[in-house]
Amino acid sequence: MDMLNTLRDTLSSVQAELSTGVEKLRMNVSANIVAQQKVSTESVNEILNTSAGNELLQNFQNLITEVEENGAEGGRLANLCSTRMGRCQQMCKEKADAVMEIDEFLRNSVEFDKKIREINAQISKLTRFCNQTEQAMTYLEALCEVAHTEGEVDLIRQQAKSAATIVQIECESPSVLTSALRSRPEDAVKAQQEEVMLEEFLSSKNMQLP
């Protein structure tokens, strides 16, 4: 409020001084242009030499400087806004193109349905392949288990054969000893018979001698 009052007083003083200066100019008007310019210059200088005129001129200069600064800042912001608007326009164009492509794709329902059917067929093939792979893996696991079981059975058979061989040897050993024992008395009887036959032969020879 004080600033407005001060400005009003300043304008009033300037107006009064301008009126005085104009009256002086009217009184000193001459036909010579140079004289008029001289009078005008003197009047302006006289006005500027006053405190109110000097203050008003300073205010005008400050306002002009502020207007220039605001103009430069406005130009900078305008350039920045233009750059951002260009980017926004490019982004909107890309989004619009994408939306148009989606719209065109959705409008072509036949092609869309065809692609869905192709995808379903590929999924069915993949599912069948996975099932076949699972069955093959199960079959391979069963084969591995059978091979492992057969290996264990062969090992058991070999162990059984070895045990049977050992048992057979143990069973045959007493019969061999028994046969050996049985053959010994027969050999003794045979030897005794041979001795008797030899003695009879010798005795017969002795009896035939003169």
From Swiss-Prot:
Superkingdom of origin: Eukaryota
GO cellular component terms listed in the entry, alphabetical order: BLOC complex; BLOC-1 complex
GO biological process: endosomal transport; positive regulation of gut granule assembly
Signal sequence, renumbered to the chain: none
Subunit structure: Component of the biogenesis of lysosome-related organelles complex-1 (BLOC-1) composed at least of blos-1, blos-2, blos-4, dsbn-1, glo-2, mutd-1 and snpn-1. Interacts with snpn-1.
Biological role stated in the UniProt entry: Component of the biogenesis of lysosome-related organelles complex-1 (BLOC-1) involved in gut granule biogenesis.
Protein family membership: Belongs to the dysbindin family.
Name of this protein: Dysbindin protein homolog
Annotated source species: Caenorhabditis elegans
